[in-house]
Amino acid sequence: ALSSLTIDGTGSTVNAGTSGLLTTATATTLALNLKGTTSTGAVTLDADVKTLNLDSATAKNTLATLSATGATAINITGDQALVLTTATTNAAAVITSTSTGAVTITSALQAGVAYTGGAGVDTIKTTTASTKAVSTGAGDDVVTYGGPVSTVTAGSIDGGAGTDTIVMTAAQAATATATATFAASVSNLEVLKLSDAANSQTINMTNADGINH
């Protein structure tokens, strides 16, 4: 079955959703090699693929949609920027980046998805009631806050090294800092950016885990 897929140049749609049927054997690991591509359509992978090794090389790579609904482990490598506008994974996926390039995932991570960032700038969005650890690693990362994490199930947000920014609406920030719960669930975030700063709210920075900008 298909075990390696390379995409370069400008494209629209790549459907590898039947790769497990190409031969009798079924591949559960796929190497997706991106080499300076801009894809405006969906890149759809077989649900039998449980481990996706995604390498971003040559130049910046952008996928409008990556559908890897079977993937429980997604490993991002490479030295070029990667943009995933919409990424659909297994609901309990573990995404690990060791990339030195910037990694941007525009769509919100599902509540049960864990994320570990690399040395580059990670730009991600969480969702409310996240049950897993989200850590962006080194670099000046940006996390858009989707809502309170579930601390009962070890949900957390860790900005890691660098000067890291959390983006919230004013209402989210006011609610989050009204108690000490938010501060207990986040760490290593240095900058609070309000996406709607004109909206007047009272924010208690003493409950913001030391965020000071």
Where in the sequence are the language-model features?
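Solvent-exposed, low-complexity segments and loops of surface/extracellular structural proteins
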Residues: 1-213
